[in-house]
Curated annotation (Swiss-Prot):
It is a multi-pass membrane protein. It comes from Mus musculus. The gene is Tmem276. The chain crosses the membrane at residues 35-55, 63-83, 92-112, 114-134. This is Transmembrane protein 276. One of its GO terms (cellular component) is membrane.
């Protein structure tokens, strides 16, 4: 069993910020959107598990982060679509994420990587589309930042802005999650 590699300060900080933003978003959205709160909570656990010392392997942590991506992100988008009356897209996103989570063992490492990035981009684009049509500025920012995180993860470079690429992606994901939490709040205020 290979234990988790040592991490540098930027990696630890990006995980902590993502966990903090996601936990705050989960707590603030639990009353109005349980699906989104569950998605934010999955992101929180995935970020914390990557840092937690213990017997878990790096591969186990990556598998947990992958499941948080393919189930957690569709859960975030589910409520955004559902409240706007787009129930078929909401169900399709969530159902697709569940199928991918179950099929993860059969995809292999490269397949899981592509599937995770595809889910991230699909969720980002669908949030962006709904936000544009409902004039939800936070939703537009959230969708854009989630998309940026997905696109940055596809780059071949190891470092961006003097930081490891994965850290920059986590920062973008944290900013997108914060904006998306605000978008959910704005959306709820519009419908009340």
């Amino acid at each position: 069993m290979v234990s988790k590699p040592r991490t540098e300060w930027s990696t630890v900080l990006s995980h902590l910020v993502l966990a903090g933003v996601s936990l705050h978003a989960a707590v603030s959205s639990v009353q109005s959107s349980r699906g989104a709160a569950a998605g934010f909570l999955l992101q929180t656990f995935a970020a914390i598990i990557m840092l937690a010392p213990g017997p878990s392997t790096h591969e186990d942590c990556l598998a947990g982060a992958w499941v948080a991506t393919v189930i957690g992100l569709p859960l975030l988008a589910f409520d955004f679509h559902w409240v706007n009356g787009d129930r078929s897209s909401a169900n399709l996103l969530l159902g697709g994420g569940m199928v991918l989570a179950v099929a993860g063992d059969h995809l292999g490492p490269e397949g899981c990587s592509v599937a995770g990035q595809a889910v991230l981009l699909v969720v980002a684009v669908t949030i962006l589309i709904v936000a544009v049509f409902t004039a939800n500025t936070y939703g537009m920012w959230g969708g854009t930042l989630l998309g940026v995180a997905g696109l940055l993860s596809r780059l071949e470079e190891d470092r961006l802005l003097l930081l490891p690429k994965e850290d920059v992606c986590r920062w973008a994901l944290a900013a997108g999650s914060w904006a998306y939490c605000r978008a959910l709040h704005t959306q709820r205020l519009q419908w009340e």
